[in-house]
Curated annotation (Swiss-Prot):
The keyword Zinc applies. Keywords: Glycosidase, Hydrolase, Metal-binding, Zinc. Homotrimer. It catalyses: Hydrolysis of terminal non-reducing beta-D-galactose residues in beta-D-galactosides. Its EC number is 3.2.1.23. One of its GO terms (biological process) is galactose metabolic process. The gene is yesZ. May play a role in the degradation of rhamnogalacturonan derived from plant cell walls. This is Beta-galactosidase YesZ. SUPFAM superfamilies: (Trans)glycosidases (SSF51445), Class I glutamine amidotransferase-like (SSF52317). Pfam families: Glyco_hydro_42 (PF02449), Glyco_hydro_42C (PF08533), Glyco_hydro_42M (PF08532). Zn(2+) binds at C111, C154, C156, C159.
Amino acid sequence: MNGKLYHGACFYPELWDEDVLDEDIRMMERIGINVVRIGEFAWSRMEPEKGRIDVGFFADVIRKLRDNKIETVMCTPTATPPIWLTHGHPERMHVNEKGETMGHGSRQHACTNHPYFRERARLIIKHIAKEIGELPGLIGWQLDNEFKCHVAECICETCRTLWHKWLEDRYQTIDRLNEAWGTGVWSETYQCFEQVPQPGPTPFLHNSSLRTMYQLFSMDKISEFAREQAEVIRAYSDAPITHNSSVMFGVDHEDLFKSLDFASFDTYASQENSQAFLFNCDLWRNIKKGRPFWIMETSPSYSASLESYAAPHQNGYLKAEAVSSYALGGAAFCYWLWRQQRAGSEQPHGSVLSAWGEPDVGYENVLEAERARREVEHIMLATAPLQAETAVVYSDRAKVFLKTEPHRGLHYRTLITEFYDRLLKMGIHRDVILEGSPLDGYKLLFTPFIHYLPPAFIKKAEAFAQSGGIWIAGPLTGGRTEHHTIHTDCGLGPLEKCSGVKTLFTFPMDERNSSGTAFGVKAPLSLWSAVFEAGGTKAVGMIEKGPASGKAFITEHKCGKGKIVMLGSMPAGEAGDIMMKKLISHYAEEAGVEQKTDVTPGTVVAPRKGADGLVWVVINMDGKGGAVTLDGNGTDLLSGRPVTGRVTLGPHDYRVILLSENK
């Protein structure tokens, strides 16, 4: 998988006759598509009847693709179990939180924990891996397809049994569970693990501990399913393994990718939401650090299903997406899908070719993206992304806690993307990292919206501050235990103890007309907030209006050579945005953050390092054009011309600049 940038598409040869297949492959080669993904929905083609397995068709397709200089990522087809596995067997099906049993006719309809499903999954994967695993054209494997895309936690009888076993392994005794969960509330106390319900229908809300733990249980079982598939494949193939995921789905990415070889994700962000696209790149670059990520699916024009559709991309945006993904650490930029499907629930979806074989509306943009790939490939292969000095922690566990306790519709993905977007617009080069990621090389660390911070993370972040880093914790951070209960020793538990503050109380500030002042700016305060008595720490932000007037909402605590800054509330509105930018600028300067560029909003700078020095890849994402100011002189590597000062870009344009070491 080394030595090139990939430009690919998801391909469904099993849906078309041989003439169409041959023409598709010829056209792919002609326009520069050099990799395809196949097989993820083809279980019934591979095993039309129980035990009658034949994957020869796909082996032949891989050979034919290779003959045309196109490489293949092969998938396991477990997202779409065939009718013979599900018909007449409701016990094998996914059951949602309403207690509704899923039927055949879509995808992800079976329970992935059912032992018979697991048995048949292992068997079909073994056959695929044995026949295809050593083919020269095979360069990678994708497990399943978008775990938990359409379904959340399953509450079938199989999962009930596994849930009880999971709880017993975690808590050892039922008394420990009762104590940890506080089941004395509403007389929920259990006498044995078998009595603990799943989060099915109830008159009101479930216990927070039960709801959160069930989601974590579900995530653990999906990771187990992935490990099981990977073990089968590795017995017959050395090709690297991935899974195409998304931060939208109910999986623990840190755990899931421990057993996989490279990270890949699917994204359908619009130009108006390009910050979500860039957030993904900055996150997935760090999920398997040091290894390029893949965009396994994105639309060449627009996404659609029978029930909805998105607006087509503006001309030029696809090129900007492709270049930014390569510049930010990606090795592949792939479309869903090559040829429009003539049937099924996604038949309206945008594609490279229409169902009748003509170029679709995004076709010219695909050609433009390919020209860009060819133009920047040699530079990307000779350089690598520069680690940021600023890090934002992403946590799937935090996502779970906010799903259990969303207050008034809070959504973790929205909150964390908005927080990230502020750094992006300020021109600060940033990494989005996982809870378990090392903090070496960072100077400024943000941990927003993480209700529960594990002791190991707090110890690591405190050591980071001791050695000179600045850790900004909050808002909505540290206020819950690992069991999703409230601390009883102090408001923010271990975080409070290392930050030098005393939490007086926590309450929602959104509708209490609360406001505060910090860094010379007065702004409304929002979200469920923590109010501090500064004590021996420095009060940086004070509440001036509302029930907690006169108390602190931002504090600063000296910690070794660095600092721990507590952000107890979220400044809101236009004034809040100004306050947050001042806070970030202040602590970035104090931490010695140098990776900051003077770039217009809507344009991104991706710094890379190579043998010749520092390279900036500058891309306009918003289609309005933009500019970046160089600190000194540079060379435009695409034109060979010297550049200095203010460098402008047209709509969706990109520049690749080698910075001079002599300013």
